Amino acid sequence: MKITLPDNSSRELPEGSSGYDLAKDIGPGLAKSAVAVTIDGVQKDLHDEIMTDSSVSIITIDSDEGLEIMRHTLTAQVLARAIKNLYPKSKLAIGPTIEDGFYYDVESEEVISSDDLNKIEEEMKKIIKSKSSITKKLVSKSEAMKVFKSNKEPYKEIIINESDQDDSFQLYYQEDEKFVDLCRGPHLPNLGFIGSFKLTKVSGAYWKGDSNNSMLTRIYGTAFNSDKDLQQHLDNLEEALKRDHRKLGKEMDLFHFQDEAPGMVFWHPYGWNIYKTLQSFIRNKLDKNGYLEINTPQVVDRKLWEASGHWDKYRENMFITEIDEEHANEKRVNALKPMNCPCHVQVYNQGIRSYKDLPIRYAEFGSCHRYEASGTMHGLMRVRGFTQDDGHIFCTQDQIESETALFISLLSEIYSDLGFKEFDIKLSTRPEVRIGSDEVWDKAESALENAIKKLDYPYKVDEGDGAFYGPKLDFVLTDAIGREWQCGTFQADFNLPDRLDAEYVGEDGNKHHPVMIHRAILGSFERFIGILIENYAGKLPFWLAPQQVVIASIVSEVNDYAIEVQELLKDQDVRAEIDLRNEKISYKVRDHSSKKVPIILAIGKKEKIDQTVSVRRIGSNDTEVLDLKEAIKQIKKENSIQH
């Protein structure tokens, strides 16, 4: 049979050869590092037979795919077995990989806490030390059920029973065959390939994420090919904890959450300063780029959500209200809007539109609500109530490319001003199930791609990952400690204008549906503020800082001068506060430095007489004495985004 390799070269191998046979045929070095194989785009175990002509690539342990497989094997074959060894009555649920790691969910009569992680790690090391080979058996549904019924693993039985498969269930064993797990694979050929690992935390998780089901114990871990890479990751985790926006939010008195309004932010004055400043910044950019700001209702009748199609797809995530309307035969059912797009179409639909009116760019700081399960919420990063920097562009097919280019330029400018000089772009193309003709899709995909190319931005294509109603662009930021955040989106939509009867009169005198482009730059204010706080470790750029300047008196006799300085700074639109407390200046400096105040002006008798201020900047132990007018001039300059 003919095997085609990634470089388009080919080799002839006997039918039934494995990926390992191919690796050996290519060279002993490759065979030594091979851990799995990709056959016609599908990952398989290294020793799986290849039966027909195929395109094949070998996955090595030092590749990203190899690392993922190592983590998968570690959770499914090592962590799971260690848990069963230490807690024989425990029941195994699922053990997937996640970004930079893995977890396993188990039901245990004994409490498993973070204090037990070292013990579990030691048991895992014993298992790895065996360097046991891992073998796979393919069995029927009834055979798989029999195995896990015998092993008293009810969660595995549920998974098997709910599967659409009738055969080819994959059971993975180690050499002694004393442990078996159900898994899609692939796995490492043996445990000797496992590198460095660390169990990181224990938490609770509902089976299938449903609060009506059993609460399970979730054990998290991470793994890398070397001690160095593992330590770097653990150092990053430690740094991330220091930067946690929830911790800094409390220290800086920015916001809080409470049980009476789960997932809803209580913004404090300083946090609201950040929010307002960011909103004003975005509003100014949008205004300069031809956007028309609108505001639409938060509570909308279900009829609109049914017409848009969101009622069927989003109902479980909506907050729904019922109102007894006067003289009505039945209650009126409304929903808090989970997104703004159907409402924006209603604004567009007021009046007759001509092709000469297009493009129309609407923007809204839209307050939205979506129900998120309590276990998924995470500070500002995932909430139930949020504000989107939302926008919708109504344009013709011929205008998609120019609108794409304008949007990317605007997004780039905003990200740069906020401190993110680079970003990644992902283009998601047509899925198999879609609406619209191939001609329309060709035109839209080419428009997005051409705009990126003309602006000379690197990008990658995600084939088939677009929405059923149009291709899209995703924009991903990388923060100061290397974490990626998908924020911006640009999504073409051929569906909603049709469903909601959005039209324009074309040059031909006939009515046409416009293309509707959903776009956002920040995503949501709440999440983006969380990202900013963590990116800057609370030390936000001066123009965005919640408290920009604190004037701290050294003695009470200079309080009047401190107030005068504050007023002069406020006249220059600087967020300036005074600290006249009867405390030592060293205490005041420490206190305000801990709250990440960029500039502290210390004022004593000498400063008052000389009309100067002692300037202390965050992160520096040095103090600079400046003439008051010069200090205000410098601070005013720093308050400009482009200073």
Residue ranges and their predicted role:
Residues 1-93, 98-643:
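NTP/phosphate- and nucleic-acid-binding module
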